[in-house]
């Protein structure tokens, strides 16, 4: 250290405010202004900027109105559960606000036609299909450090294959290689993510642990680093099929907020994902309207302000699609009652997450 170290004196004889001022001035000389500041004076830390997830119910369940910018988010679940769909809806919502989004397609499986149907402006979406995990994370680091990207999706952690594994032979045992890669990348990325206010969404897959007798045998790939660095972790599951006559036209989906550093966790919400359409906004407005008491349900009939909307859920959804004014009115009322709804949304017990452990808020 070029500056002389502060002299340590007895607590009884020192003036704490003067000592603190001296320490702060030394830190600012050495590391620059703003290296240490009072939390309340840092406006950025007080105001959480969010982007809608594309699901009205999930935005309410998250407690802050959407997914937070400047943070790491993990979306995990079984195959075909809606992980990429949810991430693409977030991209579409960010683009509506004029944001720049990037998609690192490590799985080489992004369908631009499906993305366009979800509302993504594919002509404005930056995409990279890297050859190996190190390249993917270097590209992510460069994009985050630029400060120009609002949302960055990495799909998926399981597909971030280390270069050494690609160059090796089939059957080579390389234990912990991907976990070390993720741990190093997140150590580098985390400060840049906060400074650039970029939301980084990692999509992850589920694997089964062998020989587990108690708790959940499920675990996510890529080691434990992502679990610690993520501010929000979402567990998405398909819980049923939506049929039109005998044809399956969509999935009933449940999302549980397993970890949330910004609001109380463990809330869960259900919505419909329709094939070729994505998250069904009409279905959510109908379900949340019933929970908030804005839409009345009597038997199979749905009604609003004494006006019948239809018999059965699908007919009521069709009525909402045909009457955008009524839909907008119900949506405004739902948003005004979001505090009440947040309490009514089923709060799951802190069940064991995808690692057989009780999730912590950190």
Curated annotation (Swiss-Prot):
It comes from the Bacteria. Gene3D superfamilies: P-loop containing nucleotide triphosphate hydrolases (3.40.50.300). GO terms for biological process: DNA recombination; DNA repair; SOS response. SMART domains: AAA. It is found in: Cytoplasm. ATP binds at residues 77-84. One of its GO terms (cellular component) is cytosol. InterPro entries: AAA+_ATPase (IPR003593), DNA_recomb/repair_RecA (IPR013765), DNA_recomb/repair_RecA_CS (IPR020584), P-loop_NTPase (IPR027417), RecA-like_C (IPR049261), RecA-like_N (IPR049428), RecA_ATP-bd (IPR020588), RecA_C_sf (IPR023400). Pfam families: RecA (PF00154), RecA_C (PF21096). Its main location: cytoplasm. Coiled coil: none annotated. Keywords: ATP-binding, Cytoplasm, DNA damage, DNA recombination, DNA repair, DNA-binding, Nucleotide-binding, SOS response. One of its GO terms (molecular function) is single-stranded DNA binding. PROSITE patterns: RECA_1, RECA_2, RECA_3. Can catalyze the hydrolysis of ATP in the presence of single-stranded DNA, the ATP-dependent uptake of single-stranded DNA by duplex DNA, and the ATP-dependent hybridization of homologous single-stranded DNAs. It interacts with LexA causing its activation and leading to its autocatalytic cleavage. Belongs to the RecA family. PANTHER family: MITOCHONDRIAL DNA REPAIR PROTEIN RECA HOMOLOG-RELATED, RECA. NCBIfam families: tigrfam_recA. This is Protein RecA.
């Amino acid at each position: 250290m070029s500056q002389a170290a502060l002299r340590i004196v007895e607590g009884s004889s020192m003036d704490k405010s003067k000592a603190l001022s001296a320490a702060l001035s030394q830190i600012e000389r050495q590391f620059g202004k703003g290296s240490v500041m009072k939390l309340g004076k840092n406006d950025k830390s007080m105001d959480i900027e969010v982007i809608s997830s594309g699901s009205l119910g999930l935005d309410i369940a998250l407690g802050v109105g959407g997914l937070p910018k400047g943070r790491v988010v993990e979306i995990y679940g079984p195959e075909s559960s809606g992980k990429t769909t949810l991430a693409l809806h977030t991209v579409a919502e960010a683009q509506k606000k004029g944001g720049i989004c990037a998609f690192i397609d490590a799985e080489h499986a992004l369908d631009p036609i499906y993305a366009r149907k979800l509302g993504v402006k594919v002509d404005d979406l930056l995409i990279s299909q890297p050859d190996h995990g190190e390249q993917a994370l270097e590209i992510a680091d460069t994009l985050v450090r630029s400060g120009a990207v609002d949302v960055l999706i990495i799909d998926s952690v399981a597909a971030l294959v280390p270069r050494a594994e690609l160059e090796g032979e089939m059957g080579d045992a390389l234990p912990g290689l991907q976990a070390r890669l993720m741990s190093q990348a997140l150590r580098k990325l985390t400060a840049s993510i906060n400074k650039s206010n970029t939301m980084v969404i990692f999509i992850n897959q589920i694997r089964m642990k062998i020989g587990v007798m108690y708790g959940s045998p499920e675990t996510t790939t890529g080691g434990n680093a992502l679990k610690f660095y993520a501010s929000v972790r979402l567990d998405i599951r398909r819980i049923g099929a939506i049929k039109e006559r005998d044809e399956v036209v969509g999935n009933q989906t449940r999302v549980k907020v397993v970890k949330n550093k910004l609001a109380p966790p463990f809330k869960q919400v259900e919505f419909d994902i329709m094939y070729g359409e994505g998250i069904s906004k009409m279905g959510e407005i109908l379900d949340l309207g019933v929970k908030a008491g804005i839409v009345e349900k009597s038997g199979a009939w749905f009604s609003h302000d004494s006006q019948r909307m239809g018999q059965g859920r699908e007919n009521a959804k069709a009525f909402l699609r045909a009457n955008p004014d009524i839909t907008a009115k119900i949506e405004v009322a739902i948003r005004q009652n979001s505090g009440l709804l947040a309490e009514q949304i089923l709060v799951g017990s802190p069940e064991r997450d995808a690692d057989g452990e009780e999730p912590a808020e950190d």
